[in-house]
Amino acid sequence: MLHLVIADSELELAPKSIVDHPAIVNYAKRRNKKPEEVLLDSTYHHSALKKLEDGERRGRPDIVHVCLLNALESIANKEGKLRVYVHTRNDEVIYIKPETRIPRNYNRFVGLMESLFKNGVVPEGLELLRMEEKSLAELIDEIKPDGVFVMHENGESMKPQEFGKVLAGLQSPLVVVGGFPHGDFRSEIPGKKISLYKAPLMAWTVVNEIIINFEHWVL
């Protein structure tokens, strides 16, 4: 079983310090929501992000959206060989049941995440998505993998197919992919740093390479 964690993801509700900012207020009003209940999104809240620490990397739910679409629609997931988790910058962990169908439409995805932040589970009863306050270290300790790998541009260079073989040789490997646009991980992560290419790659590209090359050896 491969455990994939999209970590330090820039997925959060609008922070209290900027809920009165016109960009947030007007956006929330258009959507008939309270400012504190909307997902922070750099596309709409660029001017408000300038007021935040690390503002240049925050408000990127699109990264999580594309990563989840790719991972949950993969053959590995359909064959029961994959578990996917999202860890956020504020140390929340989203547990995702393999049968979950993430909305392809981005606006619907945003609405789903806002409901999850508000209610802790969605949909009520089925709990396909469940959120808990938990650090990345606590999640890793809970999963108890027999190998932890951190995808990092300064990691040990390894060809994707070679890395897939390494993962396939373990019972319960865990791979961490950054859910942020640039910069480094905020969390301290134990594990071996791995780089699959000579230049930086987008998170969803890394997710694809990991899963496809893992599938090559296990399916």
UniProtKB/Swiss-Prot annotation:
* Main enzyme class: transferase
Residues of the site described as Stabilizes Arg-60: D62
> At which residues is there a site annotated Interaction with substrate rRNA?
R60, R101, R104, R108
Q: Where do transmembrane segments lie in this chain? A: none
Which GO molecular function terms does the record list? rRNA (pseudouridine) methyltransferase activity; rRNA binding
Q: List, alphabetically, the InterPro entries matched.
A: Alpha/beta_knot_MTases, Rbsml_bgen_MeTrfase_EMG1/NEP1, Ribosome_NEP1_arc, tRNA_m1G_MTases_N
Annotated S-adenosyl-L-methionine binding sites:
G178, G183, L196, Y197, K198, A199, P200, L201
Q: Which reaction does it catalyse?
A: a pseudouridine in rRNA + S-adenosyl-L-methionine = an N(1)-methylpseudouridine in rRNA + S-adenosyl-L-homocysteine + H(+)
Q: Name one Pfam family in it.
A: EMG1
This protein's record includes keyword RNA-binding: yes
- Write down the EC number: 2.1.1.-
Q: Which Gene3D superfamilies match?
A: 3.40.1280.10
Q: Does the keyword Transferase apply?
A: yes
Q: Keywords, A to Z?
A: Methyltransferase, Ribosome biogenesis, RNA-binding, rRNA processing, rRNA-binding, S-adenosyl-L-methionine, Transferase
Q: Which family does it belong to?
A: Belongs to the class IV-like SAM-binding methyltransferase superfamily. RNA methyltransferase NEP1 family.
Q: What NCBIfam families does the record point to?
A: PRK04171.1-5, PRK04171.2-2
- Describe the protein's quaternary organization and the partners it interacts with: Homodimer.
Protein name, UniProt field: Ribosomal RNA small subunit methyltransferase Nep1
Report the source organism. Thermococcus onnurineus (strain NA1)
